């Protein structure tokens, strides 16, 4: 079975085509700048070479259509006929209370995703455009939605509710949903395989640290708690997002800066985090470089960033009554060695000891970076959200 995985954003489409017989990647790439000037597709060839092709893409339908053309291309493609694609799996950011597991797309699913656009206006609208484009270009091909927050749906009410009048949850569904769920799901299962743990009797803390970041407490294979909230703004300090903040600080600043709600939302999402503290960049590689060169704001941002991660590790260890393993994943977590070390520093009393020599060498590969006598294992696991989506798609379509 061949499964195409799509992640359709507001102006982009990332894709991977899998042969599910052996889970090999047949083709992958991404479309950028849909609806804008200078739109293009980047294709990664099987030999690792990357090819960029400029192409006018006014909307998602043309974006998906051009992905199909590239898949069929004799030089850079991987198939001879679109009928070779048995199913399409989509990443969908917000499933709300409606979707607690992956589903085959039908009209009611499309309607449900549209209803949830209030909670994720940019993301869900992009996903819908992708779903409808595939339906238009490949009618009758089964499509599956895998929801980013579905893995977090096992959170108990005392963990996901906010301490505001209960009727606001009932009426407006205001609660903690969490995000990066497909990543947390993959790495929490994979770390148990690496360490030989029984997932149904395990206490895992997963740290998905990229430009956006979140931590999850996974108890016996199910999420007990996670750091992101109603939106991806809560929790850790991030590239350009503030993370946890006193709600009164927000209303105070709105008054002082004469900001409207959407302006404040943009401010907290796009101009805060390490970018806001340093004024340099939202990219942690730039921040680490500046810190090493003596930039005091960059050094402060790193301390703040690592301190938040450490606080969540401590909090979730308490919430689960202990921890067996801590996982670092995503771009920053997989590649920035100092951040991993400093986030676990002074946690020896919890049984967490980093092997500095091993940790310093590990970038983007599976590895245990704790010492042999560390009671808690610290592990780097590169995430693979696409294979989770492909597996769910195959399973649902096959059944």
Task: Please place each PLM-identified region on the residue numbering.
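Internal helix-turn-beta structural module
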Residues: 299, 303-319, 324, 333-399
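N-terminal glycine/serine-rich phosphate-binding loop of ATP-dependent small-molecule kinases
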Residues: 1-96
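Catalytic phosphate/nucleotide-handling subdomain of diverse soluble enzymes
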Residues: 219, 225-260, 266, 330-361
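Glycine-rich beta-strand-to-loop/alpha-helix junction loops that act as flexible
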Residues: 9, 90-93, 209, 323, ...
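Glycine-rich phosphate-binding loop of actin/hexokinase-like ATP-binding domains
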Residues: 151-255
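Phosphate/pyrophosphate-binding loops at sites that engage ATP/ADP/AMP, CoA/4′-phosphopantetheine
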Residues: 70-85, 191-198, 313-324
């Amino acid at each position: 079975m061949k499964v195409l995985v799509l992640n359709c954003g507001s102006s982009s489409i990332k894709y991977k085509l899998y042969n599910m017989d052996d889970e090999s990647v047949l083709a992958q790439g991404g479309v950028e700048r849909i609806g804008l000037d200078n739109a293009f597709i980047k294709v990664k060839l099987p030999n690792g070479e990357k090819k960029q092709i400029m192409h006018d893409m006014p909307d998602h339908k043309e974006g998906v259509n051009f992905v199909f053309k590239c898949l069929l291309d004799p030089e850079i493609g991987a198939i001879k006929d679109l009928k070779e694609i048995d199913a399409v799996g989509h990443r969908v950011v917000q499933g709300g209370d409606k979707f607690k597991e992956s589903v085959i797309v039908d009209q009611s699913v499309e309607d449900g995703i549209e209803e949830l656009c209030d909670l994720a206006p940019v993301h869900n609208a992009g996903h819908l455009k992708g779903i409808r484009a595939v339906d238009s270009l490949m009618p009758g091909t089964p499509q599956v939605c895998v929801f980013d927050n579905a893995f977090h749906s096992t959170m108990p009410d005392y963990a996901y509710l906010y301490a505001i009048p209960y009727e606001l949850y009932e009426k407006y569904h205001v609660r903690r949903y969490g995000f990066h769920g497909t990543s947390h799901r993959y790495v929490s299962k994979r770390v148990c395989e690496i360490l030989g743990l029984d997932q149904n009797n395990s206490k895992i803390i997963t740290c998905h640290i990229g430009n956006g970041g979140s931590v999850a407490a996974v108890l016996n294979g199910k999420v007990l708690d996670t750091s992101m909230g109603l939106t991806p703004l809560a929790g850790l300090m991030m590239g350009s997002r503030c993370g946890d903040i006193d709600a009164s600080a927000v209303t105070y600043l709105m008054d002082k800066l004469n900001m409207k709600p959407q302006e404040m939302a943009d401010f907290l999402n796009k101009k805060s985090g390490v970018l806001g503290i340093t004024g340099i960049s939202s990219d942690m590689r730039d921040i680490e470089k500046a810190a090493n060169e003596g930039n005091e704001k960059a050094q402060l941002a790193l301390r703040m960033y690592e301190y938040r991660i450490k606080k969540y590790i401590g909090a979730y260890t308490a919430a689960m009554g202990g921890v067996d393993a801590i996982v670092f994943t995503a771009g920053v977590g997989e590649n920035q060695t100092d951040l991993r070390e400093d986030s676990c520093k002074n946690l020896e009393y919890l049984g967490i000891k980093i092997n500095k020599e091993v940790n310093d060498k590990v970038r983007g590969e599976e590895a245990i970076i704790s010492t042999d006598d560390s009671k808690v294992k610290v592990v780097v696991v590169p995430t693979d959200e696409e294979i989770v989506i492909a597996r769910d798609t195959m399973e649902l379509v096959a059944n």
